[in-house]
Structure formats: structure tokens, C-alpha cells
UniProtKB/Swiss-Prot annotation:
Catalytic activity: aldehydo-D-ribose 5-phosphate = D-ribulose 5-phosphate
UniProt keyword annotation of Isomerase present: yes
Gene this chain is encoded by: rpiA
Protein name as catalogued: Ribose-5-phosphate isomerase A
Keyword Isomerase found: yes
Residues at the catalytic site: E107
EC number: 5.3.1.6
Key words of the record: Isomerase
Function: Catalyzes the reversible conversion of ribose-5-phosphate to ribulose 5-phosphate.
Residues holding substrate: T32, G33, S34, T35, D85, G86, A87, D88, K98, G99, G100, G101, K125
InterPro entries (UniProt xref): NagB/RpiA_transferase-like, Ribose5P_isomerase_typA_subgr, Ribose5P_isomerase_type_A
Gene Ontology process terms (BP): D-ribose metabolic process; pentose-phosphate shunt, non-oxidative branch
Length: 228
């Protein structure tokens, strides 16, 4: 199966999961990215079961609204039973690298409110040690150079994310992203705390302190479920 076929397979499995596990009238938490987009498409078939959805990005909001979902502000919501999102890397403990799509801060906020984080990914995302995928760090623009020096001191090679058109990439929050290569992430919880304490960092794309509760992994043998 191709990677796109695996993503579609696991997105449908996640839709089946929330249909069974999320009570009618509840609010659904929805992530960002190519796999999350396929999940939105799949879960739209029974969108009327939900009171609405909380989205982690403007892009996901647009896709949800195109399907007729009511998109709610997180400040209006008391509880999110399940948050569904993809990952750029995930290890055996359920810790993840996220932020390839640029929505890491809002993803982390919505995930922090959810009772369960369901990660959906194809088999290539499951790794023994994270770090091959450059680690995204969202940064206040004025602190870009100072934060880059701190990340270099940690052994990383930060690079400012650019758009396809050659401009500086800006997040939905108006910040910039440093993508940090060269890090061997053998202590994801510790590294998440260390980078988040650097002045000017909004958040790092490490989801270890609040990792996945469930992994739905698309493989050539079907969808494998892991509970953490």
C-alpha cells in the first residue's frame, strides 16, 4: 500500500473509533495536517452526532466548515473527550514530534484539554528514537536569533522555516518557526521542558509531557492499535 492509502486507512479507523467512543452531543477535537484532513473527510459522514468541533488551525477550521461542522472556540468548551491528530514521529512511549504543518501551539493547547489523544499515523512515523524529522519550535519573531543560538548550544541546527514563495513562514499566531535538525531525542520529556523554558519560545513541537493515549498505526497488515 502507498503512504496515501495507509493514511486513508488509518483516518477511517479513527472515524470508527470516535463513532464508538465519543458520546453523542460531545465536542470533537481535531488536529491539522494531511492525515487529519482525511479524518475530517471520514468523520463528516456522521457529523450530526457531535455538538461541534474544536480545531487546531485555520486550515482545519475551513475544512470542517466545508463539511458543515460547527466549529467552536475553545473558550466556549468545557470538555473534549477525544482529540485526533497526526504526528511527524512517534516513539514507543507515545511521545511525538509534531508541527510539520505549522500548528504545533494550537495542537498542544487543544490536546491539553482533551481526555484522550488519539494519534493517527502511517507506519513510517513510528521510530525508535525521534530526531530524524527536524524538530519545529514556534518562536516570537524578535527572539528568533537569540533562540537559535540556544538551540545550537543544545546541539541542534536550527533553520528558519520559509514559504514556497521564499518568504518567512508565519504561524496562525503570527510567529515564526525554527526547524531544528541534528537532535537525537533520547529524553523527550526533558528536552521539551528545556526548550520551552527558553525566553522567546512559544512552544516546541515535542508532545511528551502530554503524549498520545492511543496510536492507530496504518501498516500493510491493516491498522494496529496501541494504548499507552
Amino acid at each position: 500500500m502507498t503512504q496515501d492509502e495507509l493514511k486513508a486507512l488509518v483516518a477511517q479507523a479513527a472515524a470508527d473509533y470516535v463513532k464508538q467512543e465519543v458520546p453523542e452531543g460531545a465536542v470533537l477535537g481535531v488536529g491539522t495536517g494531511s492525515t487529519a484532513n482525511l479524518f475530517i473527510d471520514a468523520v463528516a459522514a456522521f457529523k450530526d452526532r457531535f455538538a461541534g468541533a474544536v480545531s487546531s488551525s485555520e486550515a482545519s477550521t475551513r475544512r470542517l466548515q466545508q463539511h458543515g461542522f460547527k466549529v467552536l472556540d475553545l473558550n466556549e468548551v468545557d470538555e473534549i473527550p477525544v482529540y485526533v491528530d497526526g504526528a511527524d514521529e512517534i516513539d514507543a512511549s507515545g511521545a511525538m514530534v509534531k508541527g510539520g504543518g505549522g500548528a504545533l501551539t494550537r495542537e498542544k493547547i487543544v490536546a491539553s484539554v482533551a481526555r484522550r489523544f488519539v494519534c493517527i499515523a502511517d507506519g513510517s512515523k513510528l521510530v525508535q528514537t525521534m530526531g530524524a524529522f527536524p524538530l519545529p519550535v514556534e518562536v516570537v519573531p524578535m527572539a528568533r536569533a537569540a533562540v537559535a543560538r540556544k538551540l545550537q548550544a543544545l546541539g541542534g541546527q536550527p533553520r528558519l522555516r520559509m514559504t514556497k514563495e521564499g518568504g518567512i513562514y508565519k504561524t496562525d499566531n503570527g510567529n515564526v518557526i525554527l526547524d531544528v535538525a541534528g537532535l537525537k531525542i533520547d529524553d523527550p520529556r526533558g528536552l521539551e521542558q528545556t526548550i520551552n523554558q527558553v525566553p522567546g519560545v512559544v512552544t516546541v513541537g515535542l508532545f511528551a509531557l502530554r503524549g498520545a493515549d492511543v496510536l492507530l498505526l496504518g501498516t500493510g497488515d491493516g491498522v494496529q492499535r496501541t494504548d499507552y
